[in-house]
Amino acid sequence: MSEIRVSCASSGVSVSAARDQFSSLPHLKAWIELEFSVSVSEQLLLTVAAEQVKMAHLGTQNELFVFDRSVVGGTVSNEHKYSAPKLKTLTPGTDPSQWALTVLTHCSRLVEETKRVTAEIATIKRATNVAITQMKQHSQNLDKNLLNVKEYSKELNQGITPLLSVDLAQLRDNTRAVKLVAPAVFGKKQFLNDWLDLQQLQSIVVEFKADFPSCMDKLQTLEQDLAQLSKDTQTLVNSTDVWIGGTNSDVLCNEAVGILRKLSELTSGDHVTNEAVKSVQNCQSQILDLHKALSKAKFQTVQHSQKVLQSISQLQSRSTKLKPKLTHIGSELTKYEEKRVQAMKQVDVEFVYGCVLVEMLRRTVWSQSGGENGSVKSEIGTRVAWKKQFQDTFPFVDILNEQEDLTIDTISTSSPSIVHNLVIARPVVTDYISQVSSKEVRNNLESLLGGVTGSAAATSSFPRSLFRNGSISGSLMAERAPISSATNADDKIRGYEARIRKLEDLLYKQRMSQDTSRWSVSPGTPSAGFAVVSPGQLSSEARGSSLSPEPTETREQVKAREKAEEEARKAEEERLARDKAAAEALQSKVDQLSQSLLHTENEKNDLMANLASMESDFSRERRCLVQEISELKLRVEELEEQVETAAETSIERHQRADQETEELEQRLKAMTLAQNTVDDENSRLKITLQDMSQRLYTGYKRNCVLLESLGLQAQKEYDADGSEVVSFDIHRVKGLRKKHRGKKGEKTEKDSESDSTDDFSALYWATKTTPDSFESSYRTFLARIFLDYDLYVEKVAKRFEDLEHLARKLQKEARNYRTMTQQLDDETRSKIALNRFKVGDLVLFLPTRDPSRQPQPWAAFNVGAPHFFLKQKPGRELKDRDWLVGRITGMEERVVNGGIGDREENPFDLGQGLRWWWLEAEEE
């Protein structure tokens, strides 16, 4: 069973699979999704020939390439930094020989990895080359379509140019003077001008002058865009060819294989010397360096390949946008061509009408000649070609096509060329040609008329295309394509008809000879022994007898003679009547035979047609049978070969079965030993599983604690048996953070709290389950520790965003409050305080009314009359001032303890126990 290799273009990994493994393309794509982790919707499958994979390719192709659309399209970022693989260097131990063997095993594994990496690099380059090939094919197809549209537009422009120079007034005058030969036949129109729609023709010409240049400008702009696209494509191809052809990775891989071979020779001996140890270390370091170099080369190859594929995707995206524009321009040109053809039909109406007259004349001449000088089938072919040539020009052309039954019987027994009893004479056609104003059209019509001779042989031919040269008249005189009417089947039929005609002539002559022999003697004819005497003979005889010397007749003799003459006359009349009746009977018989002959002729034609059909069916059936016999013979030979092969295979299978029996016995022993090993491994795995379960459960609980510390809580719903998580959500719980910190918080009616209880029974699921319930217990454990990490990350991130938003909001409010405080402070500092003085207030000081004291005391102006006095400073002169505004720099509170006159304790003679303040101020 042959296999097909499927390679991933982004990683270079290749996997082989059986060809008959896949029943459909969806099946193949589902398998690729499992193998390469590329979703079905993002897969692009290409063959080595850069064709999209179809079901038929699975049986013919040896390798398929898988492209990831998300990587090719650039939706997945490929900006990754290279991280070198961490490789362990083995140091020498106490046993150099054992260490050398370990190094050899380790290096062998590294060399195998280098081979695999080299193969993956080659696969990536092949896949990139396939993508480049597909891009070039796409670009070439687009250039080819553009070339076709350009050629089509060039021909259309050449066809439109003469149309724009047509003089419509001259055309109207020329056609107005032409009177139709039979108005009743030509739709009851009197003149050729009645078939024209000059208003429509004028609108088409105006549209060509106004809109067609803009269409050509669009085509020119599109041509420039496609030229730039082709240039960019070629630039990408040239830059990629050198990279694809590089062989640096192969050189590194071959070098690693050579070093491994040298290392194997060093470790082949029983004892490893100190010099060999150094050589082994050197080989080990070289292989490690080569492995790192190849790993870096693969990383660079993947990065470069992704950039190339993304460039290809961008170029194809540009071409995809340009292709509809090219298609739209092509459709516009097609519409212009249809309008051009419609206009040229009216411009060439003189030539079309002349062709109709010439064809009428040719058919009239052919019908009048009886078709003796030409083949009927050739005439049919000529008429069919003429109909195909002119059927889409003007409705009056249909007068030569309607009621035409182009078959052998109708065209040979009637005159189908003279439709509606319309017979055209050569002078009518000649007169019309002389009225045509265009010399080119006149010459073409004269050339066609010259082909209509007196015999009117049906040998005319017509051009393949009507308007290829710009007009009907110019097209008709272009390259001619002869109509072939002679085939082998027709020759055989004509030979059979000639033989049948000869046999019918012989049969007809034989019947006529028999009828003549029967009709030569009528029943009333006298016998040969009696003479039939006419009246003229009797008179001559009488005259002769009167001159003779015979004696005179008696009366009795005269009566007898007259009686005999009367009887002879009556007998002659009866004979003439009988001959006339016989002639009428003969004529009716001839008419009957003519009708019978015509009926026989029709039957003969039917029989000949049936004979030809049966002969064709028999020939076809015979060919099918011969082919079937040949296929059956080949099938028999194949079956005989298969039987021989099956016999040989059966013998080989018996021998192989005996060998397999022995191998199975040995494998059974090995499996018993392996079973014991597996049991030991299972015991070890159970311990590992228990440790891993504990770690997973611990991680799950820590994640839950983290959520609770943020005020979030995970909520899950299980199915009936608790093995599947039906729904999972993370929502915020008010007060949960306070509870987590051990603080108490107030609760509203809508507040809710969640008490999470630890279910440690799920932690020991591996030790409490049986092999039958292992799967269900495992699924239950997974359900218990399930966390939707996408939702987890989303909720935590959103929570942090909310906290950051709240912090920014509070910071903004704090800045606002700080600004307001500063503003209030500034405002306060600029106002004079009246009470509740404090350091920094602006105070108005006034002199007291006790001028006897020296120096005169000053008091602070305030509300409520508390005692605030200004403390004098040395050098300050206030005696000549009426007021002082100063800012308090210091305050000293005092209580009166001394009596009046005590300058230290009561300098202002205040009452005992009264509280007063010394104020130190700086003048503002």
From Swiss-Prot:
Keywords: Autophagy, Coiled coil, Membrane, Protein transport, Transport, Vacuole. This is Autophagy-related protein 11. Residues 552-582 have a biased composition (Basic and acidic residues). GO terms for cellular component: Atg1/ULK1 kinase complex; phagophore assembly site membrane; vacuolar membrane. Residues 552-682 form a coiled coil. Transmembrane segments: none annotated. GO terms for biological process: autophagosome assembly; autophagy of mitochondrion; pexophagy; piecemeal microautophagy of the nucleus; protein transport; reticulophagy; ribophagy. Pfam families: ATG11, ATG17_like. Involved in cytoplasm to vacuole transport (Cvt), pexophagy, mitophagy and nucleophagy. Recruits mitochondria for their selective degradation via autophagy (mitophagy) during starvation. Works as scaffold proteins that recruit ATG proteins to the pre-autophagosome (PAS), the site of vesicle/autophagosome formation. Required for the Cvt vesicles completion. Homodimer. The keyword DNA damage does not apply. Belongs to the ATG11 family. It comes from Yarrowia lipolytica (strain CLIB 122 / E 150). It is found in: Preautophagosomal structure membrane; Vacuole membrane. The keyword Transport applies. Residues 514-533, 538-583 are annotated as: Disordered. It is a peripheral membrane protein. GO terms for molecular function: molecular adaptor activity; protein kinase binding. Residues 514-525, 538-551 have a biased composition (Polar residues). InterPro entries: ATG11, Atg11_C, ATG17-like_dom.
